[in-house]
Amino acid sequence: MKDELNKVVIYTDGACSGNPGPGGWGAILLFDKNERTICGNNPDTTNNRMELTAVIEALKFLKVAYNVDLYTDSIYVKDGITLWIEKWKINGWRTASKLPVKNLELWLELDSLASFHNVTWYWVKAHAGNLYNQKADILARSQISK
């Protein structure tokens, strides 16, 4: 069934002025022949929360299941969803240091959304010339002062 799903490529980014402070997020969704941008802000947040929010909002935008290639410049998001989350679940949402997982409500939402879609996760180096990562970065930063 997963092979029959439509495909979308998503680039996400989050930004924050101060940490914590006002923040913004942006996502570029590349469908077969269309490009869609979405963005938003939060007056009091952290960079990691904005990175997670960008991914969550991009996946929420998709109303049916998709094959998703998702690109993030956040190692926190990429490693969290691909390496850490299963261990967190086993450990009662505690880290390897036995501390509560930060941003738990966002991780729970992301886990649910990611399981609805068929997501392949990619890390892309920030500010390294990737066009769509740069577009997502510009979107995210543009939302900080709104």
Curated annotation (Swiss-Prot):
GO terms for biological process: DNA replication, removal of RNA primer. It comes from Ehrlichia canis (strain Jake). NCBIfam families: PRK00203.1 (NF001236). This is Ribonuclease H. Belongs to the RNase H family. It is found in: Cytoplasm. The keyword Metal-binding applies. CDD domains: RNase_HI_prokaryote_like. Mg(2+) 2 binds at D13, D137. Its cofactor is Mg(2+). Residues 4-145 form the RNase H type-1 domain. It comes from the Bacteria. Endonuclease that specifically degrades the RNA of RNA-DNA hybrids. Binds 1 Mg(2+) ion per subunit. May bind a second metal ion at a regulatory site, or after substrate binding. Monomer. InterPro entries: RNase_H, RNaseH-like_sf, RNaseH_domain, RNaseH_sf, RNaseHI. Keywords: Cytoplasm, Endonuclease, Hydrolase, Magnesium, Metal-binding, Nuclease. The lineage of its organism: Bacteria, Pseudomonadati, Pseudomonadota, Alphaproteobacteria, Rickettsiales. Its main location: cytoplasm. PROSITE patterns: RNASE_H_1 (PS50879). GO terms for cellular component: cytoplasm. Mg(2+) 1 binds at D13, E51, D73. Its EC number is 3.1.26.4. It catalyses: Endonucleolytic cleavage to 5'-phosphomonoester.
